[in-house]
Swiss-Prot record:
Family per record: Belongs to the alpha-IPM synthase/homocitrate synthase family. LeuA type 2 subfamily.
Name of the featured protein: 2-isopropylmalate synthase
Species, as recorded: Bacillus pumilus (strain SAFR-032)
Residue ranges of the region described as Regulatory domain: 439-553
Record InterPro entries: 2-isopropylmalate_synth_dimer, AIPM/Hcit_synth_CS, Aldolase_TIM, IPM_Synthase, LeuA-like_post-cat, LeuA_allosteric_dom_sf, LeuA_N_DRE-TIM, PYR_CT
Entries under CDD domains matching the protein: DRE_TIM_LeuA
PANTHER family, per the entry: 2-ISOPROPYLMALATE SYNTHASE, PTHR46911
Length: 553
C-alpha cells in the first residue's frame, strides 16, 4: 500500500540555523578530491574487483590526478589487505599521492589496519562509528555518551599506534549516519576526537561529514555543514570534508552546497558508483567547475576511454545519460536542437570564437575525447533539416541549400520512421544518394554534345523506357540550353530557381557537388550531381530535378 503517513522527516536542523553560505556564488577553486572507488565503490559491485583489477583501477585514479585515494578496509578481507601490501611493498604509490585506509572504532580492526600499512611513507587512517539516533537505539543500544566514548577510545588507540610507526600518519574521523544524527551531538563527538588528536596547521586532521543516507534537501545539508564549519575546534588545523550519497538524487548539490558552506574536501567515486543509488559522482562535480571556466585539477580529456576502462574493471555499465560521461550526453535527436547546434557550430567557425558557447552543448565534446561527427547530431524520426545538413557537411563536405536541406530532412526522417530506428551517417548519405544523386525513374542522361552557334546549342542522348533517343535545345548558356531541351521534349513548365555548387575537397582532384532546384506551380524539386567536372555535376543535378518533377506530376 502506498502510504505516505508511515514516513516523517529524519534529519535534524542545527541549533543556530544560518544561510550565510548562499552568498557564495560558485566554486572557484577545486576542493581536495578523494576517490573512494577502491573501497566504498568496490563494496557496491555485484562482483568486487580482484587484486589485479584494483591495481589497474589505482593506476587509473593516479593518471586522472587524484592526490588522495581510499585504498581499503584492510580488516575486511584478505584481498584488501593484500592490495595494501602490494602497493607498499612494490613502491607503487607516487610521492604526491596519499593513500587512505578505513577502520571502525574497534580495537582489533584498528590494530589490523596498522599492520596493513606498515612501511607506508604516509597515509590517512580514517576512523568512523555510527552516531545516528536510529543506530544508537536499534543497533548499538547505547546512550549518546557511550557512543561518543566509542569514538574517543578509537581516537586514542589510533594516535597511540601512529606514534609507534615511522610513517607519517594523518587522522580522519567520520560520524557515520550523520544525516540522522543531532547536529550539535555530531559536533560534540568531532570536537572530542580532535581534543585527543590535537591537530596543528602543519599536520591537519580531517573531519568528514557523510550523508550516509540522504535525508534532506541540499540546502539543509549545507546549513548543517555551515554550523560544523563555524563551531569546529582547531578550525585552522582541520580539513572539513563531505562524503555525499545520492539517495534523493541530490549528491552533486550536497557536495557543491557543502563546499560553499565551508567544506574543503570531497569524497566520492567516478560515475557515482556506490551502495544503493551511489556516491557522489566526482566527474560531474569536476566538470561542473570546468564548464564555468575553473580548473578542477582532475584530467578527463579522454573521458570516453576512462568510461570504457571503468566498465571493464567493474562490470558496471555507465548510464548513457550520465552527466558528461554517458554515451549520449552530447547527442541531439530533436530537429530544433540540431538546427541550433548546427548554426552555433557554423557561427563559431566563421567568427573564430574563443569561448565555448554553442546552444544545447554545455562543454566542448572534444575536450572530453569525443567528436562532433558521431557524438553530437544523430538522426531519427524526430530529427530535422539542420542536423541532417550538418552531418552531410561535416562528414562529406556537401553543403545543401536551405530549402533542399529541408526536403532531404523529410526523406531521411521518413526512412527512420519506417524502420523505427536511428540512421547511421552512412545511411543518411545513402538516402541523399538514392533520392537526389541517382534518382532516374523516368529517364537517364547518357551523353550530351554542345554545338557552336548564335546561341548555345546542345544535343542530349537519353535512355527512356529502354530506348535511346536524341533531343535538341538552345539557350543563352549551357545549363539553359539543356533545360530548354528537357522542357520541350517532356512538355514541362518550370523555373530554375536555385543553383549552387561546392567543392568536396581542397586539392585539384576534388569532386564538386552541384545542387539545382526547379519550381513548378509553387513547389520545389531538387537534384544533385557529383563529378570532378562542374559542368558534368550541374547537368546531372538538373536531370535528377526534372525526374523528381516528372514523378510528382
Amino acid at each position: 500500500m502506498f502510504n505516505h503517513k508511515k514516513y516523517e522527516k529524519k534529519y535534524f536542523l542545527p541549533p543556530n540555523l544560518t544561510y550565510d553560505w548562499v552568498k557564495n556564488e560558485t566554486l572557484e577553486s577545486a576542493p581536495i578530491w578523494c576517490s573512494v572507488d577502491l573501497r566504498d565503490g568496490n563494496q557496491a559491485l555485484p562482483i568486487p574487483m580482484n587484486l589485479e583489477e584494483k591495481l589497474e583501477m589505482f593506476q587509473l585514479l593516479v593518471e586522472i590526478g587524484f592526490k588522495e585515494i581510499e585504498i581499503a578496509f584492510p580488516a575486511a578481507s584478505d584481498t584488501e589487505f593484500r592490495l595494501l601490501r602490494t602497493l607498499i611493498d612494490h613502491h607503487m604509490i607516487p610521492d604526491d599521492v596519499t593513500i587512505m585506509v578505513i577502520t571502525q572504532a574497534r580495537e582489533h580492526i584498528i590494530r589490523r589496519t596498522f599492520e596493513a600499512i606498515k612501511g607506508v611513507p604516509k597515509a590517512i587512517v580514517h576512523l568512523y562509528n555510527s552516531t545516528s539516533e536510529a543506530q544508537r537505539r536499534q543497533v548499538f543500544k547505547k546512550t549518546k555518551d557511550e557512543v561518543k566514548q566509542m569514538a574517543m577510545d578509537g581516537a586514542i588507540l589510533v594516535k597511540e599506534l601512529a606514534e609507534k610507526t615511522e610513517s607519517d600518519i594523518y587522522f580522519q574521523y567520520s560520524p557515520e549516519s550523520f544525516p540522522g544524527t543531532e547536529v550539535d551531538y555530531a559536533l560534540d563527538i568531532c570536537n572530542s576526537v580532535l581534543d585527543i588528536w590535537k591537530p596543528t596547521p602543519n599536520h591537519k586532521a580531517i573531519i568528514n561529514i557523510p550523508t550516509t543516507v540522504e535525508y534532506s534537501m541540499p540546502h539543509i545539508f549545507a546549513s548543517q555543514i555551515e554550523y560544523i564549519h563555524k563551531n569546529l575546534s582547531y578550525r585552522d588545523s582541520v580539513t572539513l570534508s563531505v562524503h555525499p550519497h545520492n539517495d534523493r538524487g541530490s549528491g552533486v548539490s550536497d557536495a557543491e552546497f557543502g563546499v560553499l558552506a565551508g567544506a574543503e574536501r570531497v569524497e566520492g567515486t567516478l560515475f557515482g558508483i556506490g551502495e544503493r543509488t551511489g556516491n557522489v559522482d566526482l566527474i560531474t562535480l569536476a566538470m561542473n567547475m570546468y564548464s564555468q571556466g575553473y580548473d578542477p585539477k582532475l584530467n578527463f580529456n579522454n573521458l570516453e576511454a576512462i568510461r570504457k576502462q571503468y566498465e571493464k574493471l567493474t562490470n558496471i555499465t555507465v548510464h548513457e545519460r550520465q552527466p558528461y560521461s554517458g554515451e549520449m550526453v552530447f547527442t541531439a535527436f530533436s530537429g530544433s536542437h540540431q538546427d541550433a547546434i548546427s548554426k552555433g557550430m557554423k557561427y563559431r567557425k566563421e567568427h573564430h570564437v574563443d569561448k565555448w558557447d554553442v546552444p544545447y552543448i554545455p562543454v566542448d565534446p572534444v575536450d572530453l575525447g569525443r567528436n562532433y561527427q558521431t557524438d553530437v547530431i544523430r538522426i531519427n524520426s524526430q530529427s530535422g533539416k539542420g542536423g541532417i545538413g550538418y552531418i552531410l557537411e561535416t562528414n562529406y563536405g556537401i553543403q545543401l541549400p536551405y530549402q533542399m536541406n529541408e526536403a532531404m530532412g523529410y526523406e531521411a526522417k521518413k526512412v527512420s520512421d519506417q524502420s523505427n530506428r536511428e540512421l547511421s551517417v552512412e545511411e543518411i548519405y545513402h538516402v541523399f544518394e538514392k533520392q537526389y544523386v541517382d534518382f532516374h525513374p523516368h529517364f537517364q542522361l547518357l551523353d550530351y554534345q554542345f554545338h557552336k552557334g548564335e546561341k548555345q546549342e546542345v544535343t542530349l542522348t537519353l535512355l527512356r523506357d529502354h530506348q535511346q533517343i536524341d533531343i535538341q535545345g538552345t539557350g543563352t548558356g549551357s545549363l539553359d540550353a539543356i533545360s530548354n531541351a528537357l522542357k520541350a521534349y517532356f512538355h514541362l513548365e518550370y523555373d530554375l530557381e536555385v543553383y549552387e555548387q561546392n567543392s568536396l575537397g581542397k586539392d585539384s582532384q576534388a569532386k564538386a557537388c552541384a545542387q539545382i532546384g526547379i519550381s513548378h506551380q509553387g513547389k520545389m524539386h531538387w537534384g544533385a550531381g557529383i563529378d570532378k567536372d562542374i559542368i558534368e555535376a550541374t547537368v546531372k543535378a538538373l536531370v535528377v530535378a526534372v525526374n523528381r518533377l516528372e514523378v510528382w506530376m
